[in-house]
Amino acid sequence: MADYPPAALRLVAALRKLPGIGPRSAERLALHLLSAPPGASDDLAHAVKEAKAQIKPCPECGFFSEEGLCEICRDANRDSTLLCVVEHAPDVLNFERSGAFKGKYHVLGGLLSPLDGIGPEELKIPALLKRTKQNKVREVILGFGTDARGETTALFLAKELAPAGAQITRLATGVAAGSGLEFVDSITL
């Protein structure tokens, strides 16, 4: 039975490592790249290399930046006493797209997971505690999901941040607008 050449199989395997890309999607993407006009795959390879070389975590908050502090941390119009803590850098974009948050962010780089060996030192929690005290933050919004790791991290941070005197706020959870109670699980109720 015939199969793709080894280089094509390596390309499919590399694409499968991307989040949300299964075997069929990886194969389709690989075939597209191999069938694309000359230079198209070079453009993609160059863009990936350039992004990896130029984009680094902001030293203040952990969001994406090309030049030292990110755009958000450099913005003097942002409320530096209002801090939203998120798991990963893309979470910042979700808040930004809402247009509702005018404070600053802190990216932890993950959530606490003792079973996986992820404690406060593996995340940017010490930097968060230091930043909260130094910047006299008055409110910290914990922008995590409600799964076990999100809840564990939120409880831990609430306890650790309490001495700083900042108000600790969680994201709203519950019944979605327009849905009836017959569709809501018992935990939400």
Task: Give the residues covered by each predicted segment.
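Glycine-rich, flexible loop/turn motifs
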Residues: 57, 69, 91, 108-111, ...
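Solvent-exposed alpha-helical segments within well-ordered globular domains of core cellular machineries
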Residues: 9-13, 27-31, 42, 46, ...
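Short conserved micro-motifs on helix faces and helix-strand junctions that flank
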Residues: 17-19, 171
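Conserved phosphate/pyrophosphate-binding and hydrolysis machinery centered on Walker-type P-loop NTPases
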Residues: 19, 38, 51, 63, ...
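Extended interfacial segments that mediate partner engagement and assembly in macromolecular machines
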Residues: 26, 75-143, 147
